[in-house]
Amino acid sequence: MMSILWSLAAFIVALGILITVHEFGHFWVARRCGVRVERFSIGFGKALWRRTDRQGTEYVIALIPLGGYVKMLDERVEAVAPELRHQSFNNKTVLQRAAIVSAGPIANFLFAIVAYWLVFIIGVPSVRPVIGDISPQSIAAQANISSGMELKSVDGIETPDWDSVRLALISRIGDKQMQVGVAPFGSDNVVEKTLDLRQWQFEPDKQDPVVALGIIPRGPQIESVLAEVQPGSAAQKAGLQAGDRIVKVNGQLLDRWQTFVLQVRDNPGQPLVLDIERESTPLSLTLIPDTKSVGENRSEGFAGVVPKVIPLPDEYKTIRQYGPFTAVYQAGDKTWQLMRLTVSMLGKLITGDVKLNNLSGPISIAQGAGLSAEYGLVYYLMFLALISVNLGIINLFPLPVLDGGHLLFLAIEKLKGGPVSERVQDFSYRIGSILLVLLMGLALFNDFSRL
């Protein structure tokens, strides 16, 4: 219950910040263009707080924090006194109106740059992209990539950490091939490798794109030695103790801890014969994994043990931290990468290269907000930057109810020398609203199906 409330609070704070930034962009440019702003509202519904400034603008914080708006003087909406017509939105030039409309998304992009600038000033801990292992017959194996190598770049984009690698990989979904630069760890002798992506299939919301290529990142070393056996668990009932080393499972030599995890997961309620070592003494025990439900008509095995973990050596860790000026460039570059990724993913949703079930809605965003806030300020800022970029790009989509739709009408007006008829605009708004509701419905359906 507390985690739900925490996620909800982090989501509301994030939404409030991003909506305020977006609407302030519209507000600020409207004021600079001489448009009278009547109301600046964060949220919808009943006003919880309101204040009016000297220029007659009413500032409102409303009950429902799921949006916001800037109400400008406009003769198309209501009658305007003759002495105020020059302050009406509809009486401004096409370029001025386009500037006002596009200012919201631009504000979101600028906010992302500021957020990442703070991240890089504070410093973000990360792990260098060193390969721990390569899965046999995988895409990476076929490209002759081997363990111990460090991924230096993906299609020319530098990858100083695993997050950068994943960001670059996701944008390549649907491509036929990809170039990666690799070098032995600690070396700058970079070799370019070509990966054949025609058989590369994975679901971004469920799978790691790195692992889907057959690359297993170098991480903390997990030994097949038990650090803890939970009381009352299947492992304790089988006689396992902390300090036991698992050597074989059903007669097969255990090469890595993950193999044991998969054996337990895939055999709920089924006996597994374990050969173990306890203080150098060989023993044989039978483990019957407990059964836990993980969805409709699906269950997994659960043993109730924790393995011994040897932390990752310091030479594999890094902190991305820069001075004030370098951080500006890095923040801009990171924001540009996110913008390209968002546009690419939206395009691939349309072409079918990415399945529609990868679309996320407010529940997934709330979960992400709560999780990032738990990790700390740096990760919450990174989350805000990501959502801010997404909000900016989506608002530029040419749907009439979005900023992009308004820009489309203004472009048509500029080309034809007159505004689009109100009848056409009204019809377009209806169609756009229906499409937006359908998309939101699909996103919510995907959210609930992931719970």
Curated annotation (Swiss-Prot):
The keyword Cytoplasm does not apply. The active site is at 23. It is found in: Cell inner membrane. Its EC number is 3.4.24.-. GO terms for molecular function: metal ion binding; metalloendopeptidase activity. Keywords: Cell inner membrane, Cell membrane, Hydrolase, Membrane, Metal-binding, Metalloprotease, Protease, Repeat, Transmembrane, Transmembrane helix, Zinc. It comes from the Bacteria. Residues 115-186, 199-280 form the PDZ domain. It holds the Pfam family Peptidase_M50. Its cofactor is Zn(2+). The keyword Transmembrane applies. GO terms for biological process: proteolysis. InterPro entries: PDZ, PDZ_6, PDZ_sf, Pept_M50_Zn, Peptidase_M50. The chain crosses the membrane at residues 98-120, 377-399, 427-446. It is a multi-pass membrane protein. GO terms for cellular component: plasma membrane. Zn(2+) binds at residues 22, 26. Regulated intramembrane proteolysis (RIP) occurs when an extracytoplasmic signal triggers a concerted proteolytic cascade to transmit information and elicit cellular responses. A membrane-spanning regulatory substrate protein is first cut extracytoplasmically (site-1 protease, S1P), then within the membrane itself (site-2 protease, S2P, this enzyme), while cytoplasmic proteases finish degrading the regulatory protein, liberating the effector protein. The 2 circularly premutated PDZ domains act to negatively regulate protease action on intact RseA. Belongs to the peptidase M50B family. Interacts with RseA. A site-2 regulated intramembrane protease (S2P) that cleaves the peptide bond between 'Ala-108' and 'Cys-109' in the transmembrane region of RseA. Part of a regulated intramembrane proteolysis (RIP) cascade. Acts on DegS-cleaved RseA to release the cytoplasmic domain of RseA. This provides the cell with sigma-E (RpoE) activity through the proteolysis of RseA. This is Protease RseP. It comes from Yersinia pestis. The lineage of its organism: Bacteria, Pseudomonadati, Pseudomonadota, Gammaproteobacteria, Enterobacterales. The gene is rseP.
